[in-house]
Amino acid sequence: MSEDRQGRSTDTGKILYCSFCGKSQHEVRKLIAGPSVFICDECVELCNDIIREELEEKAQSARSSLPKPREILEVLDQYVIGQNRAKRTLAVAVYNHYKRIESRQKNDDVELAKSNILLVGPTGSGKTLLAETLARLLNVPFTMADATTLTEAGYVGEDVENIIQKLLQKCDYDVEKAQQGIVYIDEIDKISRKSENPSITRDVSGEGVQQALLKLIEGTVASVPPQGGRKHPQQEFLQVDTKNILFICGGAFAGLDKVIQARSTDVGSIGFGAKVKSSERKQEVGKVLAEVEPEDLIKFGLIPEFVGRLPVVATLEELDEPALIKILTEPKNAITKQFKKLFEMENVELEFRPDALSAIARKALKRKTGARGLRTIVESVLLDTMYDLPSQENVSKVVVDESVIEHKSEPYLIYQTPAAPEQKAAGAE
């Protein structure tokens, strides 16, 4: 006997039955044949309903697990000091991004546009830490890329596709997970073109990289080799859709404040109605950056198409001395807490006096390294102590004060007083 693909018997008198529900070919509209089995249209519809319900349940659980903007902000506050405006902007943008993914799964009529994020702020102000904390909170794959190493395809350097390669490595090549991850591209200001006008020569690490990043950030299907590189052309490439990957770009944008100030004071610069530019009105860099407009970024050297694909702009302020002291002591993984833990493992208490914390903050401000330089300073003043301590006995406490930071004095070591030997009771032999 032979059957066609619809399950109709080519031999008369032979009735076929659905292998799942047992109904005959006369009781259903369609019977589909498989290898030695049949399935009717009713069972197919039932299977579709089951799958649809499971997908809806999965979407609901994802929605319930997605933290609200206020909850995101509370977690960011535990790790990042200050920068309240930037944290609020990020919390809302990330929440809306993952709501957008949910709406795409439902096939809603209204398609929500992708909102990638641009972080603008001085070095050491917390841009990278914000992105890392977000990824940890949302439990999604996260990778970082350095824009200065990227070049156009075909030139020496990293291709932009390598960014997706790194993201895949973070989630063990699970394409579904990678397609909902977060990518942080640092030093994005370093790929600005050299002048505001389009270049007639090839700029493979500046404007060329911006052009290469356009489709990746907006949403495209990137072909990525499973094991990286192009050494094995016979390998089957993985197809990764980037339309649901959140891209966060960050940069210090040194000199952008001058571009903004030039724009804001450019109106009426000649004649009786001219605004007088006073040198006394020197604003803080952070406050100036908060007034950034897309036109300022274009004038700085980003191409208009690239700026258009980063609609959410969050600016970070320069950290002052009180903020740096808080960074040293308050976050969950504060630097002083980390070193105290290291000393605790040697059964030694570590104390930082308030004047020492102020001195560390002042030194970081002087070096213009922001929060990133705090660890370097603490590491350098405690290096010799950490070298000698494991070999020393009876040390109970190490104290760091201002003189240790400012004058490179040795930290104070407090020793345990040896216990007095027990005296024998009177009359004992």
UniProtKB/Swiss-Prot annotation:
Using the record's annotation, list all stretches that form the ClpX-type ZB domain: 6-59
Chain sites annotated for binding ATP: P122, T123, G124, S125, G126, K127, T128, L129
> Where are its TM segments located?
none
Q: Name one GO biological process term.
A: proteolysis involved in protein catabolic process
Where on the tree of life does the source sit, at the highest rank? Bacteria
Task: One Pfam family, please name it.
Answer: AAA_2
Q: Which residues bind Zn(2+)?
A: C18, C21, C40, C43
Q: Which GO terms describe its molecular function?
A: ATP binding; ATP hydrolysis activity; ATP-dependent protein folding chaperone; protein dimerization activity; unfolded protein binding; zinc ion binding
**InterPro entries, per this entry?**
AAA+_ATPase, ATP-dep_Clp_protease_ClpX, ATPase_AAA_core, Clp_ATPase_C, Clp_protease_ATP-bd_su_ClpX, ClpX_bact, P-loop_NTPase, Znf_CppX_C4
Entry keyword set = ATP-binding, Chaperone, Metal-binding, Nucleotide-binding, Zinc
A GO cellular component entry from the record: HslUV protease complex
Work out whether the entry's keyword set contains Metal-binding.
yes
- Name the SMART domains on file: AAA (SM00382), ClpB_D2-small (SM01086), zf-C4_ClpX (SM00994)
Q: How does it assemble?
A: Component of the ClpX-ClpP complex. Forms a hexameric ring that, in the presence of ATP, binds to fourteen ClpP subunits assembled into a disk-like structure with a central cavity, resembling the structure of eukaryotic proteasomes.
Entries under HAMAP family matching the protein: ClpX (MF_00175)
Q: What is the purpose of this protein?
A: ATP-dependent specificity component of the Clp protease. It directs the protease to specific substrates. Can perform chaperone functions in the absence of ClpP.
Family stated for the protein in its record: Belongs to the ClpX chaperone family.
According to UniProt, the name of this protein is ATP-dependent Clp protease ATP-binding subunit ClpX
Protein's organism: Stenotrophomonas maltophilia (strain K279a)
